[in-house]
Amino acid sequence: MPQHDQLHRYLFENFAVRGELVTVSETLQQILDNHTYPQPVKTVLAELLVATSLLTATLKFAGDITVQLQGDGPLSLAVINGNNQQQMRGVARVQGDIPDNADLKTLVGNGYLVITITPEEGERYQGVVGLEGDTLAACLEDYFLRSEQLPTRLFIRTGDVDGKPAAGGMLLQVMPAQNAQAEDFDHLAMLTETIKSEELLTLPANDVLWRLYHEEEVTLYDPQDVEFKCTCSRERCAGALKTLPDEEVDSILAEEGEIDMHCDYCGNHYLFNAMDIAEIRNNASPADPQVH
């Protein structure tokens, strides 16, 4: 059995092509736990999680990445936030009924794929592409073609392992500033495309690579763990409250007695009473714990 929730990087010795392989189970489960999404939405979030992990691994700097789908369909928003440490969180917003067999275009409607990269040092970058492909992988390949102009292929699979949702994916990319023959890249892509969900989700990474590329020389590097981690905090909520007009905050306090701020990503609640608000306005940080 593979060690789920790990990202593996690998290189082809005889081609200027790099690869990545990721499988997620526990991280995906934690993203889904706090919500009751229809199955097609769960699948989209699983694919987005895999894609974000793979994209994050292509970054050469410390920082955050957000991959989101947005449109006028019943799935108005689906987003995964991640960072170079492979710490992930995600959420979706559903408006209206979703049929069990809904595909990506039915879910999102007329929409966009938005990728936002925020380095710890340097300028923020955002790329936007229309949802012209039939799958998330196809849309992401279009993004790479338009933005980085590096030949890139993604292969994403979803399923269940031991009754729990799981997902996996592989990425192939021509290495920057190196010449790779188009036929070599296409050959490797054809091999990778044969991967089945069951193989990717149940076999160790070395076995997957052996099955796909046993005639090639491949170097597999040490894996990086993938985990769910939410960045919400009481301090961040306090900062958000501080930006609201005093009249609006006071009105909520008068009506409700306290302000309940809920994190859509992890389900945490942060409660603020009148004394907390007074401390916030005096630039102090209220120390009450959050409510789970």
UniProtKB/Swiss-Prot annotation:
Redox regulated molecular chaperone. Protects both thermally unfolding and oxidatively damaged proteins from irreversible aggregation. Plays an important role in the bacterial defense system toward oxidative stress. GO terms for molecular function: protein folding chaperone; unfolded protein binding. Gene3D superfamilies: helix hairpin bin (1.10.287.480), Hsp33 domain (3.55.30.10), HSP33 redox switch-like (3.90.1280.10). Disulfide bonds join 230-232, 263-266. Pfam families: HSP33. The keyword Zinc applies. It is found in: Cytoplasm. GO terms for biological process: protein refolding. This is 33 kDa chaperonin. Under oxidizing conditions two disulfide bonds are formed involving the reactive cysteines. Under reducing conditions zinc is bound to the reactive cysteines and the protein is inactive. Keywords: Chaperone, Cytoplasm, Disulfide bond, Redox-active center, Stress response, Zinc. One of its GO terms (cellular component) is cytoplasm. Belongs to the HSP33 family. It comes from the Bacteria. The keyword Chaperone applies. Its main location: cytoplasm. NCBIfam families: PRK00114.1.
